[in-house]
Amino acid sequence: MTWVRNHPVVVLWIAIAVITAARLASLVLTPLNLGPDEAQYWSWSLDLSAGYFSKPPMIAWLIAGSTAMCGTEEYCIRLFSPIIHAVTGFIIFLAARRLYDERVGFWAALTYWLIPGTSFSSLLITTDVPMLLFWSLALWAIAEMQSSRSWRWPILLGIGIGLGLLSKYAMLYF
C-alpha cells in the first residue's frame, strides 16, 4: 500500500489503461445502435464542413477520423469517446495537481473516470465529449498561469477555448 501512495502517477496510468480498455471492449461487445444524434453526426462526417446547422464541426471531424481508421461499424464511429475521456481525466489530474497536490489530482481524475455520466458517455459519441476535453485543457492552462509567467499557458488557454468552441458552442460559458 505504501508503494501505491508513493507512486500515484503510475497507479493513475494503470487505472487509465484498465478503464479505457474495458470501455473499448464494451463498445465492441455491446450491440448498441447509433442514437439519432450520433447518426446525424455520422452523416455529417461523410461531407465535412466548417460547421453545421446546429453544431460546430469537431464531432464530424472526429467521426471521419475514426471511421477512416476502422470502418463504419457503430463501435468505430464511437471509437474516440473512451479515448478522449481517458485524456480528459489525465488533464483533470494535471490541473488538480497544480491547484492542490498529487493526491487530490489522483482522486479528481479517478472520480471523473468512474462517475456514471462519464461511464455512459464513453459509450456514445456526442459533442460533449470533445468539449469536456478542451474545457479541462483550458482549466489546466489557467491553473498553470497562476504560478508561471510562461507564454505557453495563455497560448494553451486560447487553443483549449478555440477547440472547445469547435466542439460545442456551450464552451462560451467557460
Question: What residue ranges belong to the model's regions?
Answer:
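Start-transfer (signal-anchor) and selected internal transmembrane alpha helices
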Residues: 1-23
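Short helix- or helix-capping micro-motifs
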Residues: 16-19, 108-116, 161, 165
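Extracytoplasmic catalytic/substrate-binding loops of multi-pass membrane glycan-assembly enzymes
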Residues: 29-41, 50-65, 71-76
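Transmembrane-helix motifs of polytopic, lipid-linked glycan transferases
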Residues: 79-100, 137
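Hydrophobic core segments of transmembrane alpha-helices in multi-pass, intramembrane catalytic enzymes
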Residues: 85-88, 112, 127-139, 174
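Membrane-interface transmembrane helices that cradle and orient dolichyl/undecaprenyl
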Residues: 97-103, 138-153
